[in-house]
From Swiss-Prot:
Keywords: DNA-binding, Flowering, Metal-binding, Nucleus, Transcription, Transcription regulation, Zinc, Zinc-finger. One of its GO terms (cellular component) is nucleus. The keyword Cell cycle does not apply. Transmembrane segments: none annotated. The keyword Protein biosynthesis does not apply. The lineage of its organism: Eukaryota, Viridiplantae, Streptophyta, Embryophyta, Tracheophyta. This is Cyclic dof factor 5. GO terms for biological process: flower development; negative regulation of long-day photoperiodism, flowering; negative regulation of short-day photoperiodism, flowering; regulation of DNA-templated transcription.
Amino acid sequence: MSKSRDTEIKLFGRTITSLLDVNCYDPSSLSPVHDVSSDPSKEDSSSSSSSCSPTIGPIRVPVKKSEQESNKFKDPYILSDLNEPPKAVSEISSPRSSKNNCDQQSEITTTTTTSTTSGEKSTALKKPDKLIPCPRCESANTKFCYYNNYNVNQPRYFCRNCQRYWTAGGSMRNVPVGSGRRKNKGWPSSNHYLQVTSEDCDNNNSGTILSFGSSESSVTETGKHQSGDTAKISADSVSQENKSYQGFLPPQVMLPNNSSPWPYQWSPTGPNASFYPVPFYWGCTVPIYPTSETSSCLGKRSRDQTEGRINDTNTTITTTRARLVSESLRMNIEASKSAVWSKLPTKPEKKTQGFSLFNGFDTKGNSNRSSLVSETSHSLQANPAAMSRAMNFRESMQQ
């Protein structure tokens, strides 16, 4: 009796299932057995394709003739006929590979055709002989640069007159050539990068800021320095000079209520030279106006009342008019007086009737006070601010 069973074949790690009805007892149902190795002509072909072939060595497979054709299309790895030479795996899967080969060949042909057409176009593009005038300034001083990358019909031109690029059939660029400061250094359009110094300004009338004459706000000198010459800082002359500096801010701005723009009396009185083309005047200071008569700060005492001042000749000078004396100028005078008094062996016998900064130097029988006068006068005469604070402190201690 014949028995049917399923057999599994493993080739190269892959299982192949097939229905093989094998009847070992019925010799009539078996097909003649073919020996692959018996034919010497086919042995060479089998040995050459043994690396890719699923069959290794001579195989004896008894198969029915009726099932031979039915199992032919089930799996490509099953040999359909032993009479034919075995095929490789690449040859079995030939439909897909043939399609890929066709696609590759078509791509190669398209690339060759495009390369030939591009070569023809590149040879066809030539520099135009006719120059197009600039549409902006209508000058004929133009230059052909190159063809547009996207459209061959729009070449790029450059105008040497107005320094602009434009494309034929397109819009013109309003941006000049270059990237700002590096390219525009030699062009007249780069004047806004220049910095105007004080030498470029018209300083012909700058000498009239200081004028000499008598005024209510004049700076007077007392003692040895009292002569007929007085220096005046006029605000009207400063306001008249604003017309000569066109394009700049005024060097001094007058504030309302006679207030000073600087909060401290030792601040610099001139403007910054890097912003305003106005030279410094180190000998002149801005007058400080008094805020109240009872103020205890230095440099802000009113002089409306008549006061008695003593100079080196011990003669009193009465002032009937209100005068504003510069603080730094007064400090220099008083420092020179203190230096002269410290060198003298005796102190002045008379005391000032009015309020004076040098009441602290008057001796009251204390021997240490005389030594302090000689020491502080030499050490503090270089710094008027520190000397005035020390004197004010001593006056307050005596009171």
